[in-house]
Amino acid sequence: METAPEDRAEPPSLAAIAALVSATAVRGPGIVPAVEVRDGGPGRERTEWLRTNLQPQKQAEYAQVLVSLELGDLTSGQMRALAALARAYGDGTVRVTVDQNLVLRWVKSGQVPGLYRRLATAGLGRPGAGTIMDVTSCPGAESCRLAVTQSRGLARLIGEELARQPLLTRRTEDV
């Protein structure tokens, strides 16, 4: 049976996370990730994130945290911040899901609020992992020679429309 990691790094400060995320400008053609820094304090978004992005592990007092990525994208600054958070709150690893999201394992349940606050500061506190809000897309014509459409642009529009209709997203949970 797997056991929890013994030693962990100190959690980076909110200022350190913000500095990592803002250190590198995103550039290039096509759709690039927009970093939306959030407060991460108590509120509706955090409540929704706790409901959709947190899953208990079979080991008592531990959880796995799903980091929902819009269109599967993150910046180099966000990657650096996520690496620091994985060392401080998890086992130092980050796993990729089939939904183009990321998973941090071995997070102590009591440390989830601090982790969420730092994820939100890094622009990675997006709720809705594994729900209809979590739109997945292939690269499309941005980088695939076989593609004939801008599937990422359409996926972004679908995600924005779903975000404007919270009642619709609630109704699809049992589908």
Where are each of the predicted segments found?
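Peripheral terminal and linker regions in Fe-S/redox and tRNA-modifying enzymes
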Residues: 1-175
